[in-house]
């Protein structure tokens, strides 16, 4: 039976933080997507069809190209390997990939091969027609040899491989099987976004990512219920040697099925505008998470959140780390304990994601050496002023400069761990300077909170926050509570 309990947020955010160090090798069908938008105001006099008055046109990379675009957008490195034509569509794809910053050495443009393109025509953002230009043709011997050569050359520098099969010819006639065998020999995981009914050509892949309909077609009958999904996935695992299957289930989320265990992740989509390219986003994010150390269930949870973001966009969409982080906060909540301890750059990305979600972000700071009731009261009051609270924590060196050589009593790691475990605190950032000014400038919180022993004109960073449209709040302190006082009592042997 499928388990429905979601993974904890810590491994999800930890994996996302590692995306920047991942390189993904992407092989498959590159497609040029065109989007023509306009209005329909009359019926043609030539035939009973509407006349679309064009108002604008955009182009984007589709198919394996959209997988590459999502990987790069999420801060990782992508190496595309494919064969396209020397036509206008092919030239456009090479240019787009180069502008994106992806490597293009693995692309081969061949005369006599048509680059696939899909043109979508919409009236007021409602799609009314799709026009495809393509020729489904397997690679010839020369094209195949070139693709395998490029693949082998790039494989050593990649942590994971994606085969993006849109059935246009690149992975037909045993090419997919040969690439999978090369990956297995090299010890590299390979994920497949499959096409068609015959999954034997993907035998030995680490995982496949069919949607519910594709999964049913692969086993010869429709699947809907949880147990049907599990049975179908395990049939494919047994027949073709997959390590696991990740089945996307539209509004019902995703199922991760292995030989012995299955988990279900509920959908996170808020409002669906366009499903174009959502599967590309899912496999791109899943691959990055897996290569970043997440287990398959955690990786699927991240990919599921990513899919929920892009279906809320129009066109062949991609997403950013900030959008993905925000989606995970909606679905899994904030990180806890030590995983809420961030460096300044990670905190800045987190704050941007919170603000993107419409959440107010507060900031306070201090040494917090020996935690006492006064600290807890201050943090509780600060958190009551905002949706998310970031705590700037003086480093050990900073505390020594401010308080003297006998301080801190607790080192910065211990202090940060204790503070991060408090419900009032959403993130802790250790800073080395004597004041948090640079950190405040980097985060630009909406609300800056300090104790009432300050005045607004003496609060460090008050002018920065106010100039950015934020506000400064002074909260009452608990009388008689301080770390210095606590240390004095300990030295005197007093507990009164």
Curated annotation (Swiss-Prot):
Cytidylyltransferase: annotated span: 363-496
One of the record's GO molecular function terms: heptose-1-phosphate adenylyltransferase activity
Keyword ATP-binding found: yes
Pfam families to which the protein is assigned, alphabetical: CTP_transf_like, PfkB
The keyword Mitochondrion is annotated on this UniProt entry: no
GO CC annotation, single: cytosol
Cross-referenced SUPFAM superfamilies: Nucleotidylyl transferase (SSF52374), Ribokinase-like (SSF53613)
One GO BP annotation of this record: ADP-L-glycero-beta-D-manno-heptose biosynthetic process
InterPro entries found in the cross-reference section: Bifunc_HldE (IPR023030), Cyt_trans-like (IPR004821), PfkB_dom (IPR011611), RfaE_dom_I (IPR011913), RfaE_dom_II (IPR011914), Ribokinase-like (IPR029056), Rossmann-like_a/b/a_fold (IPR014729)
Keywords: ATP-binding, Carbohydrate metabolism, Kinase, Multifunctional enzyme, Nucleotide-binding, Nucleotidyltransferase, Transferase
Catalytic-site annotation from UniProt: 280
Pathway stated in the Swiss-Prot or TrEMBL entry: Nucleotide-sugar biosynthesis; ADP-L-glycero-beta-D-manno-heptose biosynthesis; ADP-L-glycero-beta-D-manno-heptose from D-glycero-beta-D-manno-heptose 7-phosphate: step 1/4; Nucleotide-sugar biosynthesis; ADP-L-glycero-beta-D-manno-heptose biosynthesis; ADP-L-glycero-beta-D-manno-heptose from D-glycero-beta-D-manno-heptose 7-phosphate: step 3/4
Recorded catalytic activity of this chain's protein: D-glycero-beta-D-manno-heptose 7-phosphate + ATP = D-glycero-beta-D-manno-heptose 1,7-bisphosphate + ADP + H(+); D-glycero-beta-D-manno-heptose 1-phosphate + ATP + H(+) = ADP-D-glycero-beta-D-manno-heptose + diphosphate
Region (Ribokinase) location: 1-335
EC number(s) from the headed UniProt entry: 2.7.1.167, 2.7.7.70
Entry function: Catalyzes the ADP transfer from ATP to D-glycero-beta-D-manno-heptose 1-phosphate, yielding ADP-D-glycero-beta-D-manno-heptose.
Quaternary assembly: Homodimer.
Homology family: In the N-terminal section; belongs to the carbohydrate kinase PfkB family.
Protein name (database record): Bifunctional protein HldE
Native source species: Mesorhizobium japonicum (strain LMG 29417 / CECT 9101 / MAFF 303099) (Mesorhizobium loti (strain MAFF 303099))
